[in-house]
Design a protein with these regions (language model features):
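Class I S-adenosyl-L-methionine
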Residues: 1-174
Length: 174
């Protein structure tokens, strides 16, 4: 998705988004939501039942409650998919839409906790969050620095902490 167009305005990394350094990344418009969702569903159908771990939103974010509910529908329809990612939406945001989106994400996480792992960015009250190393330092048993960024694993895929770990993950600013 397109960063900032779909992100909550109170995102901690509004100015320092790692998308700033991704000039060749594909940005997909969310403006025709029906078309976007149709294409996503077609991509999932093309898996032909093969298992897939989907990393949502390399750029951008959940932009409305209906879009979150679309992912609920995908999880119900396709037991072969699991989803992980991050959101700057937060239940404590001053922005009503951000709170509503975050609440819906929490419902999905509770219902599909083995298959839907969305970490809340910079939420120091939630152990299943992804926080900036600029804001929080590692605390034993509470948070760790991203193992891939520390060179402790070859890739995110060989690690898996973001979708299985029960502690906060801290990312160094890109």
């Amino acid at each position: 998705l397109t960063e900032r167009e779909t992100c909550p305005k109170d995102c901690f990394h509004w100015e320092t988004c790692y998308g700033n350094n991704m000039m060749f990344a594909h940005r997909i418009s969310h403006k025709n939501q029906n078309l976007l969702q149709k294409r996503i569903q077609e991509d999932i159908l093309a898996l032909n039942g093969k298992k897939a771990l989907i990393r949502l939103h390399v750029l951008g974010d959940f932009f409305n409650v209906d879009y979150v509910k679309f992912w609920k529908f995908m999880l119900l329809m396709f037991p072969n998919i699991a989803i992980f990612g991050y959101t700057a939406n937060n239940t404590k945001s001053k922005i009503k839409l951000s709170r509503e989106i975050a609440t819906e994400i929490k419902k999905l996480t509770a219902r599909f906790n083995e298959r839907f792992a969305i970490r809340f960015s910079n939420d120091n009250d939630d152990l299943f969050s992804a926080n900036s190393y600029d804001v929080e330092k590692p605390q034993k048993g509470i948070s760790i620095v991203c193992p891939e960024q520390e060179g402790k694993t070859e890739t995110c895929g060989t690690c898996g902490f973001c979708w299985t770990g029960k502690q906060r993950v801290l990312f160094k600013t890109h």
